[in-house]
Amino acid sequence: MTKHLTVRWHGELDFDATDEGGAIVPMSSKEGGFSPSLLLLAALGGCTGMDAVSVMTKKKVDFDTYRVDVSAEQREAYPKAYTSIVVEHIVEGRGISDKAVSRAIELSARKYCMVGATLATGDCSINHRMRISDEQGERTCDCITIG
């Protein structure tokens, strides 16, 4: 399957990407704009998030809120590639099964998230963690590291 999009320059260091359906994502080096490197992290968070929510929904996990926090370490020297990324899946709800959430994250990391799979083929490790908050309290754990 081939994917295609177009990136257009709009002066200075302002660009936008347009996909075949017409969706537009702006990019900028200016304050308040997303740089391409941050969009890469956003793509990873969005990709694994969509996978995890899909699997948790199928497993009937009773969650009210879900978010993904992504942080990364970069090399000092150019091209300043990412060397390690931490993806924290934060889930809040009632009676949440740690096993079901962990399995959803593992399936995303190992099977479904092509953004993570692509990054992990290079010189970058991706550590997926989870933080669950429900009536039992808050708990965290590392789920899986790839790359």
Regions of interest found by a model, annotated:
Residues M1-A42, V53-G147:
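Extended beta-strand/beta-hairpin segments
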